[in-house]
Amino acid sequence: NLSRGERALDWKHCDNIPWDVLLLFGGGLSMAACIQATGAASLIAAQATAFVGLPPVLVVLGVATLVIFATEFTSNTALAATMLPLLAAAAPVLGIPTEQVLLVTTIGASAAFMMPVATPPNAIIFGTGRIQIGEMIKAGFWLNVISIIVISGVCMVLGDVLQLPMPK
């Protein structure tokens, strides 16, 4: 009750909040906003031209690799918020269905295992102090490689099964 001077949260309880995890995610979302506000997003999208003319499977593998490894340095939510509009716009130029690019990006953004900032579970595990970043990087690298292959394969099969239209 605020009228009696009671607070919703006292310092004793605030002290137990994992502030480091909250700051990591706040920083990631801020970075996504800065990337869009500064025009860096357009620069990133322009780099997609390197994939033009490649077979669709290589484009999907490239997008999965880009997204999964980029997610290691910012939160998956921030990365998805930044990359989905960029890759949706680039899909027709790349010669693959927009839905397929969005699927790879969305799933890939959640498949990052190397760094604490990548996903909330990574941050929680790192926050326990029982695992070091070096251990996360070693194990996470191979999980990322497996994820790239599996996600790309699934998205290619889904593209065929759902008969997604190729851009003209």
Model-predicted regions and their roles:
Residues N1-K168:
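Transmembrane helical cores of multi-pass ion-transport proteins
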